[in-house]
A protein has these predicted regions:
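Binding-site signature for planar aromatic cofactors or substrates
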Residues: 1-131
Length: 131
């Protein structure tokens, strides 16, 4: 799956609502500000505050998200995650958060998402797989 330039631009510039689930299917959704694409297949999240989301991802490394303005950008992204508490991706989120807000706490982890599927949530073709 490859994201379009428009998809990458809107992820870069927008908040997202990120859904995870426990292994027995209890859903959880949170707003996330520190989310950005690294390339057309991967998206990075700074985990600074995740509790249930993080526990869910440790046990069930799958998530889905939509961007805040889903009326204008009606995409539902789904992917698998890897969690890094050190190394290149971790250093990248630490620097990113520090540059954006020097008063923000140091992130606990980098969450790297490999995008696997994108669906439309647009009224009319809602639910259609688009990539
Ligand atoms: C506007 C907004 C932006 C947020 N951005 C982030 C973020 O970038 N990273 C993060 O770890 N938590 C962020 N949070 C906190 C999470 O939404 C949430 O409170 C946290 O993951 C704990 O919830 P959980 O136990 O369901 O994971 C943000 C919260 C709000 C209200």
């Amino acid at each position: 799956m490859v994201m379009t330039d428009e998809m990458m631009e809107i992820i870069e510039s927008s908040r997202a609502y990120v859904a995870t689930a426990t292994t027995n299917g209890v859903p959880n959704v949170v707003p996330i500000g520190f989310i950005k694409p690294l390339d057309n297949k991967t998206v990075l999240i700074a985990d600074s505050y995740m509790v249930k989301s993080r526990a869910n991802l440790e046990a069930n490394p799958k998530l889905a998200f939509v961007v805040q303005d889903a009326a204008k950008y009606p995409y539902q992204f789904k992917g698998s995650v890897e969690i890094f508490e050190s190394g290149e991706y971790f250093d990248q989120v630490v620097e990113w958060v520090k540059e954006t807000n020097p008063l923000a706490p140091k992130p606990k982890a980098a969450i790297l998402i490999t995008i696997e599927e994108v669906y439309s949530v647009k009224v009319g073709d809602a639910g259609k797989k688009i990539a």
